[in-house]
Swiss-Prot record:
Motif (Nuclear export signal 1): 84-92
Gene Ontology MF terms: long-chain fatty acyl-CoA hydrolase activity; palmitoyl-(protein) hydrolase activity; peptidase activity
Organism per entry: Xenopus laevis
Entry annotation: catalytic residues: H39, C109
Name this protein carries in UniProt: Desumoylating isopeptidase 1
Single biological process term from Gene Ontology: protein modification by small protein removal
UniProt subcellular location: Cytoplasm; Nucleus
Reactions catalysed, as given in the entry: S-hexadecanoyl-L-cysteinyl-[protein] + H2O = L-cysteinyl-[protein] + hexadecanoate + H(+)
Pfam families: Peptidase_C97 (PF05903)
Family recorded in the similarity comment: Belongs to the DeSI family.
Keyword Hydrolase among UniProt keywords: yes
Function: Protease which deconjugates SUMO1, SUMO2 and SUMO3 from some substrate proteins. Has isopeptidase but not SUMO-processing activity. Collaborates with ubqln4 in the export of ubiquitinated proteins from the nucleus to the cytoplasm. Exhibits palmitoyl protein thioesterase (S-depalmitoylation) activity towards synthetic substrates 4-methylumbelliferyl-6-S-palmitoyl-beta-D-glucopyranoside and S-depalmitoylation probe 5 (DPP-5).
Main EC class the enzyme belongs to: hydrolase
Primary subcellular site in the record, as a coarse category: cytoplasm
Length: 169
C-alpha cells in the first residue's frame, strides 16, 4: 500500500476496445492501419482512475469490466499527495469532466488520462492514443459514421464515481 507522502509511481493502462479487430479490419474498412481502439486510465495510489459517460470513476487496478490492460506504461513519478490529487479530480468533475461533457471523439477517456498524466508527471500520454479520433475521422468511412459514433458513450464498470456532491462514493 502506498503512503500519503513520498514519490508515487504513475502508470497508464491501455486497453484495446476492439480486442484486435481494429488491427485486422482497419486496412480494409478505413484504408489505413489502426493498431487498436484505445481506452486508457491512470493508475496511482493503488487505484485506477478513468473517465466516461458517468464522469470520473475509480476502482482497483484491472477491475473494470475490461479486465487486464493490453499494455501498461510507466509515466513517471509524482510528488503530488493523494489528498491533493483527490481534490484535483473533484474539481475536474465539476468543471470539464462531468458525465455530460463526455464525447467519443472530442472529450473522452484519453483526454482525461492525458490531462491527469500532465498534472501528476508533467508528461503527456503517447500521441498514437490521443490522435486516434482524428485518424478515424480523416477517412471517408469515419466521416460517414460520425453521426452514429457521436452517440456512443463508453463507461467501463468500475467502482467509485467522483462528482460535485460527494467526492468518491
Amino acid at each position: 500500500m502506498e503512503t500519503a507522502e513520498g514519490p508515487h509511481l504513475v502508470r497508464l493502462y491501455v486497453y484495446d476496445m476492439s480486442r484486435g479487430l481494429a488491427r485486422r479490419l482497419s486496412p480494409v474498412m478505413l484504408g489505413k492501419q489502426l493498431e487498436g481502439i484505445w481506452h486508457t486510465s491512470i493508475i496511482v495510489f493503488d487505484e485506477e482512475f478513468f473517465y466516461g459517460r458517468e464522469g470520473i470513476t475509480s476502482c482497483l487496478p484491472g477491475r473494470t469490466m475490461l479486465g487486464e490492460p493490453d499494455s501498461v506504461m510507466e509515466l513517471g513519478i509524482t510528488e503530488v499527495t493523494e489528498e491533493i490529487f483527490l481534490e484535483y479530480l473533484s474539481s475536474l468533475g465539476e468543471s470539464g469532466f462531468s458525465g455530460e461533457s463526455y464525447h467519443l471523439f472530442d472529450h473522452n477517456c484519453n483526454t482525461f488520462s492525458n490531462e491527469v498524466a500532465q498534472f501528476l508527471t508533467g508528461k503527456k500520454i503517447p500521441s498514437y492514443i490521443t490522435e486516434l479520433p482524428s485518424e478515424v475521422l480523416s477517412t471517408p468511412l469515419g466521416q460517414a459514421l460520425r453521426p452514429l459514433l457521436d452517440s456512443v458513450q463508453i463507461q467501463p464498470a468500475g467502482g467509485n464515481i467522483f462528482n460535485r456532491q460527494s467526492g468518491p462514493s
